[in-house]
């Protein structure tokens, strides 16, 4: 619970502008891990230099951060929120679990730069994301999705 609370203390700036922060997260994910762009076919025709200003990238990034905010606010009691997310990402989108680990690190960097998440907060975010991703992985296994 303490880790969730520590991350939530810095969540305000993110929550105040999901679209801008979401765009930063996805653009950085695609820059640092170009292979992840292949997992988003709807962004395939967008030139790399245009990703940051693309409304679709911004909207999807906002969706990611809104869902993460809901999971954070559940403070560990997130099973009902996570199940449908796990299901769609395993069965429809076919997103390997490793990609959640990659985006979690990017979210941490963006939160450090834009929301003041300090070193202890970074550790708390890693702990929180490890819990969420482990639970997603268990959902994936139940669904028979293995990378």
Swiss-Prot record:
It comes from the Eukaryota. Nitrite binds at residue 60. O2 binds at residue 60. It is an enzyme of class 1 (oxidoreductase). It catalyses: Fe(III)-heme b-[protein] + nitric oxide + H2O = Fe(II)-heme b-[protein] + nitrite + 2 H(+); H2O2 + AH2 = A + 2 H2O. GO terms for molecular function: heme binding; metal ion binding; nitrite reductase activity; oxygen binding; oxygen carrier activity; peroxidase activity. Heme b binds at residue 89. GO terms for cellular component: extracellular exosome; sarcoplasm. Residues 2-141 form the Globin domain. It is found in: Cytoplasm, Sarcoplasm. Its EC number is 1.7.-.-, 1.11.1.-. One of its GO terms (biological process) is removal of superoxide radicals. Keywords: Cytoplasm, Heme, Iron, Metal-binding, Muscle protein, Oxidoreductase, Oxygen transport, Transport. Monomeric heme protein which primary function is to store oxygen and facilitate its diffusion within muscle tissues. Reversibly binds oxygen through a pentacoordinated heme iron and enables its timely and efficient release as needed during periods of heightened demand. Depending on the oxidative conditions of tissues and cells, and in addition to its ability to bind oxygen, it also has a nitrite reductase activity whereby it regulates the production of bioactive nitric oxide. PANTHER family: MYOGLOBIN. Monomeric. Belongs to the globin family. This is Myoglobin.
